[in-house]
Amino acid sequence: METKGRRSAAVLDQQDESEAHPRKRPTRRAPLHRDGNNPDSDAATMEGSDPGSAGRPSSDSLLQEPSQPAKRGGLLDRDAIEHITELWDRLELLQQTLSKMPMADGLKPLKNFSSLQELLSLGGERLLTDLVRENIHVREMMNEVAPLLREDGSCRSLNYHLQPVIGVIYGPTGCGKSQLLRNLLSSQLITPAPETVFFIAPQVDMIPPSELKAWEMQICEGNYAPGPQGTFIPQSGTLRPKFIKMAYDDLTQEHNYDVSDPRNVFARAAAHGPIAIIMDECMENLGGHKGVSKFFHAFPSKLHDKFPKCTGYTVLVVLHNMNPRRDLGGNIANLKIQSKMHIISPRMHPSQLNRFVNTYTKGLPVAISLLLKDIVQHHALRPCYDWVIYNTTPEQEALQWSHLHPRDGLMPMYLNIQSHLYRVLEKIHRVLNDRNRWSRAYRARKIK
């Protein structure tokens, strides 16, 4: 009994001592929370102060770093300045070109920074970030079209194996339409190379012998490509393509529409490989009553289905007038609707050229449409036998409008990129307009 009483008294003395000194706690106490994975390990209590914190801090304690100001994301690092500089050069060139056009009077003037240094210093974080993003997008558009171009920047082909190839050539007399037709085949701009070429004329006797010989030589030239060690590689299944001259009346015979008729000359040629039909000087015949529009839409699909070797079908038609009045059978109207390529000489009448540009540039800004008209007018003053080509179904959007030059080749105009750059100029114009409006409002309130 004495032992039990002494123990209870000792416990009471410890409780009184802890109540008298609330800062002092027993060195060992059951923890409030234990580790679920290690329930037997001793954990430090959550109640009271740490007796070790009063002295020297332990070497294992973590020191918090002082708060740093928020970083701005490297806005004007080297890459950002490179993007802005590259975009500024393009914007400045486009704006100078638009301002010097003869038709620039109707365009609204766009405000811009006077120099690159002013843009970098006064542009602001949001505008500069947008410009970096816009230039990245321009680079992406350039990289998308790069695989379709040669090393010198010219196009590898007109159709890039798109079938069928229905093309219309517009040009006045003496602009080089016949030479253009031969060049398209000899330079392999139309792929695949045809194995049989049908030359359609109003009368066979009106074709001069020199032109026939030129056709035979150039289609044979287009059938080969240079290979390694001075060799030549055939581009089709024949060593010598066939050249067949036909009169327009023979073309329109009924048996030439039926692919199952053994008398069909086109079906016999398509059984061996790709074919091409060239209609030169046939505008008056096309404007007659007899319809030949089957050659533009129904006939190609029938040939492709019946003859697997006919991997290419090309029809090129020459017109001296972009809007002929005589079209009794609707052949010319159907031809222009089904056409995949419109090849235009800059020497055409300006009113017809402007009407065509206005029709096929509805989705472009007005300034870019005027720029295209100025380009055509510029080449019309220089008789270089060059051509402007509009592709209704291009392989890439940058190739929709292109320029064919005897020396430079087929060069894309990149009107989609020019339209994008013009919209960037409009964005800068809106930013500067907003700043001027805010400045005027601030001054007006300050005066009041």
Swiss-Prot record:
Q: Which UniProt keywords apply?
A: Activator, ATP-binding, DNA-binding, Host nucleus, Nucleotide-binding, Phosphoprotein, Transcription, Transcription regulation, Viral genome packaging, Viral release from host cell, Virion
Gene Ontology CC annotations of this record: host cell nucleolus; host cell nucleoplasm; virion component
Record's subcellular location = Virion; Host nucleus, Host nucleoplasm; Host nucleus, Host nucleolus
**Swiss-Prot/TrEMBL GO biological process terms:** DNA-templated transcription; nuclear capsid assembly; regulation of DNA-templated transcription; viral DNA genome packaging via site-specific sequence recognition; viral release from host cell; viral transcription
> Which regions are flagged for Basic residues bias?
22-31
- Residues bound to ATP are G171, P172, T173, G174, C175, G176, K177, S178
InterPro entries the record matches: AAA+_ATPase, Adeno_IVa2, P-loop_NTPase
- A GO molecular function for this record? ATP hydrolysis activity
- According to the record, the residues making up region (Disordered) are 1-76
Q: What segment(s) does the record annotate as region DNA-binding?
A: 440-448
Q: Name one Pfam family in it.
A: Adeno_IVa2
Q: Where is the composition biased (Polar residues)?
A: 56-67
Induction, per UniProt: Expressed in the intermediate phase of the viral replicative cycle.
Keyword Ribonucleoprotein present in the record's keywords: the answer is no
What the protein does comes down to: Component of the packaging machinery which encapsidates the viral DNA into preformed capsids and transcriptional activator of the viral major late promoter (MLP). Binds, along with packaging proteins 2 and 3, to the specific packaging sequence on the left end of viral genomic DNA and displays ATPase activity thereby providing the power stroke of the packaging machinery. The activity of packaging protein IVa2 is stimulated by protein 33K which acts as a terminase. May be the protein that pumps DNA into the capsid powered by ATP hydrolysis.
Query: What family does the entry list?
Result: Belongs to the adenoviridae packaging protein 1 family.
Q: Please give the subunit comment from the record.
A: Homodimer. Part of a genome packaging complex composed of packaging proteins 1, 2 and 3; this complex specifically binds to the packaging sequence on the left end of viral genomic DNA and performs packaging of the viral genome. Interacts with protein 33K.
State the name under which the record lists this protein: Packaging protein 1
Q: What lineage, starting at the top, does this entry show?
A: Viruses, Varidnaviria, Bamfordvirae, Preplasmiviricota, Tectiliviricetes
